[in-house]
């Protein structure tokens, strides 16, 4: 325990970049049987939304989600915080409020000391404390690589429920966190992270997406999702295709972490970037590789992608400002075209 443990050296993937690619996932789900068409299931997996929502009564529903992954940072406490923050995000992305969480822990008990796992759980509990919810239990297994995450339960009023497939043409698109998480964490894993960039990605990954709960109350917010492992373009393709519209993105207006261009030039591109483009590229208008590398970068605990109709834009920006967010539109939704997404 005298030498600091580098958790990223014990995993083949990192964070949401560990996700099975959408193309492979499609094969898995296609042969797994049809979803039970329960009318009380307001949101299931048909639209690949962030969480499932089941009616408690005519006005309120329970929101259920789970998310877990392998280490994306070396520090155990930070890994726990990030994994928990990322899992809780799905509740906020539906416009809901989290109620409680249970932990999911896989640990190579013959390789890493239990004291390190304890720090991971402690970090997860810290994120739950910040969200105002209890880490009420969990389940653990002996696994070949470290894994941590949460299953989270929340609640949402039906009138506040936000989906990823209800956007309309004319909506402006907003992103609440900068891109580049996968790029900087890949640089960290390769020991190429510059001193001035240490903890930059970590701080964003540990930032809760609480604004999503506030945005749920806004009628002008027509659709919302969080940007995670499939990258901005992957999640935007799902929003556009699910809503029957197309999207135009202005590349220069997409927020990004400082230093991403430097690290891309250094070859710090996570493997998930290529898998994302391989899965969604046919739905995206042709674009240069450097734009693919940023816009398909898998995010862990990424920001909210919000579609706002023009009539509700002023109210949305006012609410965002009250929450400390200074947002500018990164694009808009238009009538459906051959491509789901075009980058200008």
UniProtKB/Swiss-Prot annotation:
Its cofactor is Mg(2+). One of its GO terms (molecular function) is selenide, water dikinase activity. Binds 1 Mg(2+) ion per monomer. Synthesizes selenophosphate from selenide and ATP. It comes from the Bacteria. Its EC number is 2.7.9.3. This is Selenide, water dikinase. It comes from Bordetella bronchiseptica (strain ATCC BAA-588 / NCTC 13252 / RB50) (Alcaligenes bronchisepticus). Keywords: ATP-binding, Kinase, Magnesium, Metal-binding, Nucleotide-binding, Selenium, Transferase. The active site is at 16. Homodimer. The gene is selD.
């Amino acid at each position: 325990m005298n030498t600091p443990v580098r958790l990223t050296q014990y995993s083949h993937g990192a964070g949401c970049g560990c996700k099975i690619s959408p193309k492979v996932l499609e094969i898995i789900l296609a042969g797994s049987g049809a979803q039970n068409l329960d009318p009380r299931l307001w949101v299931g997996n048909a639209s690949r939304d962030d969480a499932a929502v089941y009616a408690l009564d005519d006005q309120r529903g329970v929101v259920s989600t789970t998310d877990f992954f392998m280490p994306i940072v070396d520090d155990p406490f930070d890994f726990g915080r990030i994994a928990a923050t990322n899992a809780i995000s799905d509740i906020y992305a539906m416009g809901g409020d989290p109620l409680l969480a249970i932990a999911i822990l896989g640990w190579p008990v013959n390789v890493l000391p239990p004291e390190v796992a304890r720090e991971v759980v402690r970090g997860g509990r810290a994120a739950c404390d910040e969200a105002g919810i209890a880490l009420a239990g969990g389940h653990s297994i002996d696994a070949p690589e470290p894994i941590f995450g949460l299953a989270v339960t929340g609640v949402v009023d039906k009138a506040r429920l936000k989906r990823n497939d209800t956007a309309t043409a004319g909506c402006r698109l907003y992103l609440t966190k900068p891109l580049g998480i996968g790029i900087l964490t890949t640089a960290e894993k390769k020991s190429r992270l510059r001193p001035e960039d240490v903890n930059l990605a970590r701080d964003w990954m540990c930032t809760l997406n609480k604004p999503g709960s506030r945005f749920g109350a806004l009628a002008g917010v027509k659709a919302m999702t969080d940007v995670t492992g499939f990258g901005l373009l992957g999640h935007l393709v799902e929003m556009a295709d699910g809503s029957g519209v197309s999207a135009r993105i202005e590349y220069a207006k997409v927020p990004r972490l400082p230093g991403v261009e430097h690290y891309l030039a250094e070859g710090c591109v996570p493997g998930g970037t290529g898998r994302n483009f391989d899965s969604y590229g046919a739905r995206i208008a042709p674009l240069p590789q450097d734009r693919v590398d940023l816009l398909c970068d898998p995010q862990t605990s990424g920001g909210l992608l919000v579609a706002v109709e023009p009539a509700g834009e002023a109210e949305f920006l006012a609410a965002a400002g009250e929450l400390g967010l200074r947002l500018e539109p990164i694009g808009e939704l238009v009538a459906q075209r051959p491509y789901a997404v075009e980058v200008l």
